[in-house]
Amino acid sequence: MKLLAVTVLLLVICSLEGAFVRRQAEEPNLQSLVSQYFQTVTDYGKDLMEKAKGPELQAQAKAYFEKTQEQLTPLVKKAGTDLLNFLSNFMDLKTQPATQ
């Protein structure tokens, strides 16, 4: 019986000490994680700026914007015309009851 009690006591002490050691283990510092994240973002931004300095990327971007502008200009003009027609219909509806 004493042997069983001593065994249980040793197991409890070992498990408690193991939990104590786990609590003392160093947790990753939030500040270091955030600074590491910002450093990674900064490095990525620098790499991106170096790549953007190349003339071929600038030419591709310019061509893309010109193509987009060519495609969007007619759509914007049509949307403006449709909006004016829509608003003029509202103005016509408001003036009709007054004339009757």
UniProtKB/Swiss-Prot annotation:
The protein's UniProt keywords, in alphabetical order, are: Cleavage on pair of basic residues, HDL, Lipid transport, Oxidation, Secreted, Signal, Transport
GO cellular component assignments: chylomicron; spherical high-density lipoprotein particle; very-low-density lipoprotein particle
Q: Which residues carry this modification: Methionine sulfoxide?
A: M49
Checking Gene3D superfamilies in the record gives: 6.10.250.100
Give a GO molecular function annotation for the protein. Answer: protein heterodimerization activity
Q: In which tissues is it expressed?
A: Plasma.
Q: Name one GO biological process term.
A: cholesterol homeostasis
State how it assembles. Answer: Monomer. Interacts with NAXE and NDRG1.
UniProt function note: May stabilize HDL (high density lipoprotein) structure by its association with lipids, and affect the HDL metabolism.
**Which protein, by its recorded name, is this?**
Apolipoprotein A-II
Species of origin reads: Canis lupus familiaris (Dog)
